[in-house]
């Protein structure tokens, strides 16, 4: 997991303190702004993101590279699909 954390990202979305559906709505906008293959780090505190973000990635064909939980904070690394 540390190799993912050390990997440079193309963008970061801090959705700390936001509740469903806001983190996924913001994710949708941020992922659009990335280049194809770009890596986005998402930081969230809403436990529903554990369900919603993986489903978002599957539905829109993005890659959920890694996810991690640290003391109530949920971290996700998402690679935008190649167009």
Swiss-Prot record:
Localization per record: Cytoplasm
Keyword presence, Magnesium: no
Catalytic residues of the enzyme: 20
Molecular functions per Gene Ontology: sulfur carrier activity
GO cellular component assignments: cytoplasm
GO biological process: tRNA wobble position uridine thiolation
Disulfide bonds: none
UniProt superkingdom: Bacteria
Keyword annotations from UniProtKB, A to Z: Cytoplasm
Keyword flag Cytoplasm: yes
Function according to Swiss-Prot or TrEMBL: Sulfur carrier protein which probably makes part of a sulfur-relay system.
Family that this chain belongs to: Belongs to the sulfur carrier protein TusA family.
Protein known as: Sulfur carrier protein TusA
